[in-house]
């Protein structure tokens, strides 16, 4: 059997004898070389790749031959002489592994120890825990329980019948019957009554002092209000007098300004009129003087009237014109 024509298919098996190691077809039941029968120890062979064949070799146009094989894991095409894939190192012929479902960890399920446990009918389990069926029930017989209860009751009675002479139980009664003459029990009542009286007196004194202080505080407040009202009235009267004096001074200033305005209105006309000595002018002056010596109210009314002011100005102008004509 030449190596060129040797092809491994699925199901072929290897002889379990290490010296032989012959690869047999899947249909053989015994080794073809040593004659040893096929057993469960015989490992199955698996092809890691398949030959591409003549058709694919022709399509490659001389790049690959018909004996070249294609890897099943990475689909790489390898030469026929390679026993492993050039890309993923998958063997061309590999041993078929048994599918046991194990994870493949260290010593997994190889030497598993199964401890056989027998369920006992005892009260406690192997870990020392009380079983559920015995938790709410009394395990011992009723006679044992009664004996235990009797012993406990006897022990309590013995404790009660012990001598109590060593304990001084009557000391409290002796203390209650002791003489109380050394204690002044009535003094506390008298002190309480005295304290109450002193408190009442202090309260009455504080109230009277409070009323006096309030009356005193009210009297200066009333005097203050009176002084304030007086100061306000005096200030109002002063302000009124000041306003009247200001009005009078203003009226006097306005009168003097009107007089000065009249005197300075026509200086040339006055010069002309002074040169002319007319009897009419003298009469007017005498009339104005007599009016000035009279009542001030009449003088104010005459000075304020615009018609008379206009007449006097026209008269002065006529006198000036007459004097100028005489000079000519």
UniProtKB/Swiss-Prot annotation:
Q: Where do the zinc-finger regions (RanBP2-type) map?
A: 9-40, 65-94
Its subcellular locations are: Nucleus
List the biased-composition ranges (Low complexity): 211-224, 232-242, 313-328
Q: Which residues carry this modification: N6-acetyllysine?
A: 18, 54, 92
**Cellular component annotations (GO), alphabetically ordered:** nucleus
Residues annotated with Phosphoserine modification: 9, 120, 153, 181, 188, 193
What is a single Pfam family found in this protein's UniProt entry? Answer: Zn_ribbon_RanBP
Query: Can you supply a Gene Ontology BP term from the record?
Result: RNA splicing
Q: Which Gene Ontology MF annotations are present? A: lipopolysaccharide binding; RNA binding; zinc ion binding
Q: How does it assemble?
A: Interacts with the C-terminal half of SNRNP70, the Arg/Ser-rich domain of AKAP17A as well as with U2AF1 and CLK1.
PANTHER family linked to this entry: ZINC FINGER RAN-BINDING DOMAIN-CONTAINING PROTEIN 2, ZINC FINGER RAN-BINDING DOMAIN-CONTAINING PROTEIN 2 ZRANB2-RELATED
The entry's family comment says:
Belongs to the ZRANB2 family.
What does this chain do?
Answer: Splice factor required for alternative splicing of TRA2B/SFRS10 transcripts. Binds to ssRNA containing the consensus sequence 5'-AGGUAA-3'. May interfere with constitutive 5'-splice site selection.
> What protein does this entry describe?
Zinc finger Ran-binding domain-containing protein 2
Q: Which species is this record about? A: Sus scrofa (Pig)
């Amino acid at each position: 059997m030449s190596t060129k024509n040797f092809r491994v298919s699925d199901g072929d098996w290897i002889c379990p004898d290490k010296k032989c190691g012959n690869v047999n077809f899947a249909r053989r039941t015994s080794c073809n070389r040593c004659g040893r029968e096929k057993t469960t120890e015989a490992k199955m062979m698996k092809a890691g790749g398949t030959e591409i064949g003549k058709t694919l070799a022709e399509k490659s146009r001389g790049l690959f031959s018909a004996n070249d094989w294609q890897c099943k894991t990475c689909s790489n095409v390898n030469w026929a002489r390679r026993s492993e894939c050039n890309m993923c190192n998958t063997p061309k012929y590999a041993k078929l592994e048994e599918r046991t479902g194990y994870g493949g960890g260290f010593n997994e399920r190889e030497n598993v120890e199964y401890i056989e446990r027998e369920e006992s009918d005892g009260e406690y389990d192997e870990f020392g825990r009380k079983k559920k069926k015995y938790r709410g029930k009394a395990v011992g017989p009723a006679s044992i329980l009664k004996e235990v209860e009797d012993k406990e009751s006897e022990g309590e009675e013995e404790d009660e019948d012990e001598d109590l002479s060593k304990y001084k139980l009557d000391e409290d009664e002796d203390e209650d019957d002791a003489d109380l003459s050394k204690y002044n029990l009535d003094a506390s009542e008298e002190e309480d009554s005295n304290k109450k009286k002193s408190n009442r007196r202090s309260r009455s004194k504080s109230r009277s002092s409070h009323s006096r202080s309030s009356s005193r505080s009210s009297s200066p407040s009333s005097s203050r209000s009176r002084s304030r009202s007086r100061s306000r009235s005096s200030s109002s009267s002063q302000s009124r007098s000041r306003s009247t004096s200001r009005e009078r001074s203003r009226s006097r200033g306005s009168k003097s300004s009107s007089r000065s305005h009249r005197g300075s209105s026509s200086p040339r006309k006055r010069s002309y009129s002074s040169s002319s000595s007319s009897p009419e002018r003298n009469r007017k002056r005498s009339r104005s003087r007599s009016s000035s010596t009279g009542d001030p109210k009449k003088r104010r009314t005459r000075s304020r009237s615009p018609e008379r002011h206009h007449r006097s100005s026209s008269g002065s102008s006529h006198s000036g014109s007459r004097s100028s004509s005489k000079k000519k």
